[in-house]
Curated annotation (Swiss-Prot):
Residue span of region Disordered: 1-24
Keywords from the named record: Membrane, Transmembrane, Transmembrane helix
Compartments it resides in: Membrane
Any one annotated GO CC term: membrane
Membership in a protein family: Belongs to the SMIM8 family.
Pfam families: DUF4500
Gene: SMIM8
Amino acid composition bias (Basic and acidic residues), ranges on this chain: 9-20
Name the UniProt record assigns to this protein: Small integral membrane protein 8
InterPro entries: UPF0708 (IPR026686)
Predominant localisation class: membrane
Topology class, membrane: Single-pass membrane protein
Transmembrane segments: 48-67
């Protein structure tokens, strides 16, 4: 019975210290101009500020949706005055209905 030869084992060399100064883009060599133009790539994320921005943006979108909904409701109403002088809101009707 012949046994299959064992595959050669490759030794993984530990990474050199000078190769990995820090993970991600902070360790990449770049110019000062690139870092000045793109600071968000090199600054640690600030989670409270991100949460505040997400809540603010969500509230703005909700407010725009609210304004759109109320504008749609107001578009079909007008103020009518009856023969006695009382005013009331009335929905517009088409002449074709």
């Amino acid at each position: 019975m012949s046994s299959a030869p064992e595959p050669p084992t490759f030794k993984k060399e530990p990474p050199k210290e000078k190769d990995f100064q820090s993970p991600g883009l902070r360790g990449v060599r770049t110019t000062t101009l690139f870092r000045a133009v793109n600071p968000e790539l090199f600054i640690k994320p600030n989670k409270p500020v991100m949460a505040f921005g997400l809540v603010t943006l969500s509230l703005c979108v909700a407010y725009i949706g609210y304004l759109h909904a109320t504008q749609e409701n107001k578009k079909d109403l007008y103020e009518a005055i009856d023969s006695e002088g009382h005013s009331y809101m009335r929905r517009k009707t088409s002449k074709w209905d």
